[in-house]
Amino acid sequence: MMATNSQLPVGRPREFDLDEAIRCAMQVFWDRGYHDTSLPDLLAGMKLSKGSFYKAFGDKRSVFLRALKLYTDDGVRNVQEVLRSDPSPRAAIRNALVRYADLSSGSKGVRGCFGVLTAAEMLPGDPDIADLIKRLFTRLQDLFAATVAKGQAAGEIKNSRDARVIAHFIVSHAQGMRVLGKVGSRRDEMLKNIDLLMEIVF
């Protein structure tokens, strides 16, 4: 189990923000990948001494898992906020897909998705990482399925397909955009594909 701030031993107070340190580590791993990130890379990015690093995190793998969990939690929360931002379920789903297009184009697109990059680098072969990535996609599918079902109940979305099947298709398309962004796909192309998806599915 990962340690939390409340589980820390009593003693000298920590002189850095644990959550901010994990977020800095996430940026380092995101840019370099797990295997190409060295301890000096992490210490520089997190602005920690070696002693503080080992006391707080134990090892490189531990901080990587915490960074990946932070990333997946952020991603789910951001999608949830977009899906709740419009009273129309159909419009909310399109807004979420447009957000994926924004993240998948330009410099953000070339940088890629930390979750997708991690899956490509580390899987198969690491059950802990597989579980985090699998739970990310499941949580995203749950959010989209609930929004689709709401749209079906309101008559905005066709009832001819199961909401979870549609949600799986949406998430697959969204992650595909993240991959295409790595090779420089244009935002206008992605928006045309989103319009086609909306026309076919809804």
Where are these regions (language model features)?
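Basic, helix-initiating cap at the start of DNA-binding domains
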Residues: 1-32, 37-48, 62
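Short hydrophobic/aromatic patch on the recognition helix
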Residues: 47-57
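Amphipathic C-terminal alpha-helical segment
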Residues: 103, 150, 170-187, 200-202
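Hydrophobic packing within well-folded, soluble alpha/beta domains
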Residues: 21, 25, 42, 53, ...
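Amphipathic alpha-helical packing segments from all-alpha helical-bundle domains
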Residues: 76, 91, 127-153, 165
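Amphipathic alpha-helical segments enriched in hydrophobic/aromatic and basic residues
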Residues: 29, 38-39, 50, 60, ...
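Hydrophobic alpha-helical connector segments
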Residues: 66, 80-111, 163-170
